């Protein structure tokens, strides 16, 4: 779609990160500079006349599918206060009420069984997905291997052209039962061995020509062993056990990090098609030509030595934050990579911040639990490190560059530049500078690349702001050599226009630029919607953080081109957990989670943990039976009625 309708966007370094922060140790920094991006501007004349309205509807339809971003890290005992590993995890999910995950403890071991495990699981799903047992603690973030492809294929009657062959298609009927209503019937057109044909209206604008369809294939089209793998974690006694069960999972595209008292491990083993040598001439992250036999999957997959895995390396720590495991994306190119794994990873701001903070902590002395907890709550925005120096430089040129003359003698500019220059760059609730920077960042993004993205600008921005901001920063900081082609009026004028729009926003929203009139916590927070449309959710609470910070609280700024009065995050850390090991090698966890462990809105446990989550206060996750019995406030015993057998 990009290359067809928005060529200037397609030629941007779409997957080059903002920071050289990669999961595996000893990955060299390539430099975050792409030689050239081709700024071939498009008039969008080929778009349907109602394309803008279509994208608005599409943006609304996908908004609920984004689950945010996650962090985990592990530190080997050589760097910790007690000589044993530390593990941290804050998985990000949609924040609903009741919660998608719940805390639970399963113990059959005391009665001769195999289980003694505690942590969090998705409601209705067996096993503890994230937590610890008596030996092992484990965590996960989402990895982004490319496990699927799209092809533009020619169709005729009930046949599909794959390479040089016409393959018969088959219709499979899927029935979805809906309580109290008629069944929903779907006819799925499959091409055996090659995938399924997507509906014609899957995208808001046409992507293929007449008599063509989009063929979709995914390595998960078949039975897989994720349930076995997660249950295996619950019973694992060593890192070898942990790694064995990771390797059983075919489509669990997660960065699994495990720890025992003996060490730490990072492992991910998804089924990724082996597509041969990668090439920018035929990139698999774009739609492929189904008539080219060379694009069709061969049935081979990347081998174990090509997948992410390590035990901390010489540095003795592991960080994952949805970032590139290998560093293949560093130059924004596929050519020269040893194989193709994927490209659409996080821009690296969270991973970079965590890595720099861990390095600082380790250099200063043994790392403590409290330091791990503080890092989970970190709201420093690295994007300010990119944009504020540009603002300072542009404003310093106002009186020497006549092209900027309209911005001379602006007291409001003086005030805002000084405010952001002296700011600590933390997106905290009591910060007025955070309000100003957030607005300036979004306006600068729109000024820099909004015209290139055209009607899809807000769709991409609303799905995940940090990606669109990444593109703008790459242009504004000259990370592509021909960045000036994307800024026809010059960098300084672009920046000051964004500041001028920030002033207008502050005047409209707060009656002026005086920082005493606004703080981040009054306009930014998390909205907890009920999982049922007619249910009563918790509502809105002020929360720290923003897009791209370790404590992620990502919210959009625009709606239909107009700044929003309130900025709502709807996803975030569904729980935060930090785990140490006691002298007997048993994991001990400190945790906070939201909104509560009860699913009934009338329950006293429906939102009783919300305040601790907002303030990042931790409590021990009780695991020892004596501690549990001593703190039990309510119990329910279920017994099987053997008289009915």
List each model region and its residues:
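Substrate-recognition/specificity elements adjacent to catalytic centers across diverse enzyme folds
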Residues: 1-86, 91, 97-98, 123-127, ...
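Generic recognition of flexible, low-complexity loop/linker segments
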Residues: 60-63, 71-77, 83-84, 114-118, ...
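Active-site-adjacent "gating/activation" loops or surface patches in catalytic cores
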Residues: 63-69, 78-85, 89-100, 205-225, ...
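Glycine- and hydrophobic-rich flexible loops that cap the catalytic core of alpha/beta enzyme folds
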Residues: 67, 106-127, 131-290
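Conserved structured core elements
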Residues: 69, 85, 95-98, 132, ...
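Short, well-ordered alpha-helical packing segments
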Residues: 72, 76, 85, 92, ...
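Primarily extracytoplasmic ectodomains and periplasmic/lumenal surface modules that are beta-strand-rich
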Residues: 81-82, 93-95, 136-138, 145, ...
């Amino acid at each position: 779609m990009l290359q067809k309708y928005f060529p200037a966007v397609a030629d941007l370094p779409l997957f080059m990160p903002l920071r050289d922060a990669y999961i595996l140790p000893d990955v060299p920094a390539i430099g975050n500079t792409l030689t050239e991006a081709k700024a071939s501007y498009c008039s969008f004349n080929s778009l349907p006349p109602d394309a803008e309205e279509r994208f608005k509807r599409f943006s609304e339809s996908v908004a609920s599918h984004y689950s945010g971003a996650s962090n985990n890290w592990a530190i080997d005992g050589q760097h910790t206060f007690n000589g044993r590993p530390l593990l941290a995890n804050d998985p990000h999910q949609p924040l609903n009420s009741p919660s998608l995950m719940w805390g639970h403890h399963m113990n059959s071991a005391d009665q001769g069984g195999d289980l003694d495990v505690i942590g969090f699981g998705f409601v209705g799903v067996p096993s503890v997905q994230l937590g610890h047992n008596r030996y092992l603690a484990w965590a996960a973030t989402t990895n982004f291997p490319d496990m699927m492809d799209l092809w533009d294929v020619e169709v005729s009657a009930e046949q599909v052209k794959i390479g040089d062959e016409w393959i018969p298609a088959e219709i499979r009927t899927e029935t979805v039962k809906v309580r109290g209503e008629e069944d929903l019937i779907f006819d799925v057109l499959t091409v055996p061995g090659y995938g399924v044909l997507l509906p014609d209206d899957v995208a808001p604008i046409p992507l293929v020509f007449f008599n063509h369809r989009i063929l979709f294939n995914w390595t998960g089209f078949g039975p897989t062993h994720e349930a076995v793998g997660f249950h295996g974690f619950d019973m694992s006694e060593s890192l070898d056990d942990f790694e064995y069960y990771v390797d059983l999972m075919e489509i669990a595209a997660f960065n699994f990090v495990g720890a025992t008292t003996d060490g730490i491990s990072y492992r991910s083993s998804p089924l990724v098609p082996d597509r041969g040598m990668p090439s920018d001439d035929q990139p698999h992250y774009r739609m492929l030509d189904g008539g080219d036999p060379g694009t069709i999957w061969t049935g081979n997959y990347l081998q174990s030595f090509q997948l992410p895995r390590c035990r901390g390396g010489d540095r003795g720590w592991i960080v994952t934050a949805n970032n590139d495991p290998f560093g293949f994306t560093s130059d924004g190119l596929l050519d020269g990579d040893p194989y193709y794994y994927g490209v659409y990873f996080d821009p690296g701001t969270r991973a970079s911040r965590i890595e720099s903070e861990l390095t600082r902590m380790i250099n200063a002395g043994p790392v403590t639990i409290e330091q791990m907890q503080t890092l989970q709550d970190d709201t420093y925005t690295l994007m300010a490190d990119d944009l504020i120096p540009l603002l300072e430089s542009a404003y310093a040129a106002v009186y020497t560059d006549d092209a900027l003359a309209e911005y001379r003698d602006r007291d409001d500019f003086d005030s805002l530049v000084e405010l952001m220059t002296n700011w600590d760059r933390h997106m905290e609730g009591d910060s007025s500078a955070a309000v100003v920077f957030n607005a300036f960042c979004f306006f600068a993004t729109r000024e820099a690349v909004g015209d290139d993205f055209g009607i899809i600008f807000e769709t991409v921005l609303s799905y995940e702001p940090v990606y669109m901001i990444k593109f703008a920063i790459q242009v504004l900081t000259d990370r592509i050599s021909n960045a000036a082609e994307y800024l026809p009026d010059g960098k300084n004028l672009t920046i000051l226009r964004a500041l001028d729009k920030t002033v207008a926003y502050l005047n409209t929203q707060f009656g002026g630029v005086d920082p005493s009139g606004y703080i981040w916590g009054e306009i930014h927070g998390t909205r907890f919607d009920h999982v049922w449309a007619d249910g009563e959710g918790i509502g809105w609470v002020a929360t720290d953080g923003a897009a791209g910070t370790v404590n992620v609280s990502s919210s959009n700024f625009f709606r239909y081109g107009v700044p929003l009065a309130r900025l709502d995050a709807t996803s975030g850390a569904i729980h935060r957990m930090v785990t140490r090991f006691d002298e007997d090698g048993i994991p001990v966890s400190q945790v906070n989670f939201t909104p509560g462990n009860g699913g009934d809105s009338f329950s006293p446990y429906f939102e009783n943990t919300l305040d601790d989550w907002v303030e990042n206060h931790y409590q021990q996750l009780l695991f020892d039976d004596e501690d549990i019995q001593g703190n039990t406030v309510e119990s329910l015993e279920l017994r099987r009625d053997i008289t009915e057998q």
